[in-house]
Design a protein with these regions (language model features):
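Sec-dependent N-terminal signal peptides
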Residues: 6-13
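Alpha-helical segments in soluble extracytoplasmic regions
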Residues: 34-114, 122, 127-130, 134-170
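C-terminal motif of bacterial Sec signal peptides marking the signal peptidase cleavage site
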Residues: 17-20
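Positively charged n-region of N-terminal signal peptides that target proteins for export
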Residues: 1-5
């Protein structure tokens, strides 16, 4: 009986020792995981949405370009038929991106908030043209400023993560 208890005790101690030896260093794995997730997000997932975003912003800014001869009606049509639908597509694309880490989710959320502010500003400009209400233009300008601030936050967050993970970011 004592022999059986001794064997059970030694076996249990050996099992506990072996389980402890197999423990992974999760901090090193987490770093690799964040690095891979950032690279996937920035290089694979985001470029399609960024292309739509850039296209919509170019349409929005065309009215303000030097030498532009668009009238307000044409500008409104461009916003309604090109820029706003393209921004909606961009928002849908970004919203559909799945991230694996909290760090990249925060990046995605900041980028998405910036794009949503620009989208709201475009809709506000259309409303201003329809109603000729100067307050709408002031609100749109405020939204654009908020969007720019959020995009700066995104760039800062991205650079911080890149520095921590040893990633080179080409701007």
């Amino acid at each position: 009986m004592k022999k059986k208890l001794y064997i059970v005790g030694v076996t249990a101690a050996l099992a506990c020792a072996l389980v402890g030896c197999g423990k992974k260093d999760t901090t090193a794995d987490a770093g690799v995981y964040v690095k891979d997730d950032v690279i996937e997000f920035v290089n694979v997932e985001l470029p399609t949405a960024k292309a739509d975003h850039d296209s919509a912003i170019a349409a929005y800014n065309a009215y303000f370009a030097d030498g532009s001869n668009q009238d307000l009606s044409t500008y409104k049509d461009t916003l309604q038929n090109t820029a706003i639908p393209t921004m909606e597509k961009c928002i849908t694309t970004i919203s559909g991106i799945e991230t694996a880490t909290d760090e990249v989710k925060a990046l995605k959320d900041t980028y998405l908030q910036s794009v949503q502010k620009e989208y709201e500003a475009m809709k506000m400009v259309v409303s201003a043209i329809d109603g000729e209400n100067a307050d709408y233009l002031t609100q749109a300008d405020s939204l654009i400023s908020e969007a720019a601030s959020l995009m700066n936050d995104y760039q800062t967050q991205l650079q911080t993560i890149a520095n921590e993970q040893g990633i080179v970011v080409n701007q």
